[in-house]
Amino acid sequence: MLQSTKVTKSVLTNVLRVEQRRGFLLSGAAVALGSTYIFGRDAKLADAMDRGELHNKNEDYAKLRAERTEQRIKALSNNRPMEPRYEGHVPLYLHEKMLLFAISGIRAFFHPENGINIVQLGEATAFPIFLENLKQTMLADETGRRILRDQPNVRTDILDMDKLSKLPKNTFGYTFYKWLEKEKVSPDTRAPVTYIDDPIHAFVFKRYRQCHDFYHALNDLPIIIEGEIIVKALESANMGIPMATLGWMLAPLRLKKAQRDRLYGTYLPWAIKTGLTCKPLINVYWEELLEKDVEELRQELGIKMPPDLRAMRAKRKAMIKRLNEKYQKN
């Protein structure tokens, strides 16, 4: 009887263990199946989202997205002091203009190589009274009035670089083409006007900005810090550009003594004298003068070429090299 009881207990124990294992396996299988379903579904959802098939099946979704974007733009424009008055115009409040002037001024002083700093400072200092005076200068001149009426853009496709490259070497157009090639720049890199409110003032400032490279090419001044300061002094004396005045007065303070000596001794006096005595450059229709003899153009404008800045820099560099070699030999 006792032995039968032991056998019964042993059988029950084995049955219980089997049931526990079976329950464990069933639970594991259930978890695995659930995970496969859940994570497999997530993977399918992710794939569908990646293919753009999960949502946006409504044909009007693109329209809804465009409407939302337009609403955001309208909400932003409602926070501006006025409606934009031309393409790309961003109206600013007075305190925003003052902040733009302060920040761009500091950045331009310490990082003049960053073009965006110069662009922002230029517009921050383009006061309406200055722009109106420049506009009146154009209205008082027949060519200036045509420029205001035509509102031309200085771009490579309009200037036709291929045509300029085939002009006679004595023409202004060929001189301009070779200068662009030598300096590895393009007229297309000039930034559009953004923060000037009056549309005509905005064009006047854009015209000044787009013609900047013509002044470089006409006087064969390179795009280096010294060359930029010289052109800024010319623009300041000729057109009264506020940012140009700040540029030629403050930028030399950060240069080496040899550079300052060249500027103060030779180039700034030339730039200021030339700017004060030559024809107002804002009234020059450069696009119509590309086939003109470059020397005749300089004479008509009242511009005499400055000393070759590249040659002066190369001469000093060669002198320093000779002195270093002499010192090393001794």
From Swiss-Prot:
Record-stated family: Belongs to the COQ4 family.
Subunit note: Component of a multi-subunit COQ enzyme complex, composed of at least COQ3, COQ4, COQ5, COQ6, COQ7 and COQ9.
GO BP annotations, alphabetical order: ubiquinone biosynthetic process
Coiled-coil intervals: none
Catalytic EC class: lyase
Pfam families, alphabetized: Coq4
Subcellular location: Mitochondrion inner membrane
Biological pathway: Cofactor biosynthesis; ubiquinone biosynthesis
EC number: 4.1.1.130
Organelle targeting sequence: 1-31
Purpose: Lyase that catalyzes the C1-decarboxylation of 4-hydroxy-3-methoxy-5-(all-trans-polyprenyl)benzoic acid into 2-methoxy-6-(all-trans-polyprenyl)phenol during ubiquinone biosynthesis.
Binding site for Zn(2+): 212-213, 216, 228
UniProt name for this protein: Ubiquinone biosynthesis protein COQ4, mitochondrial
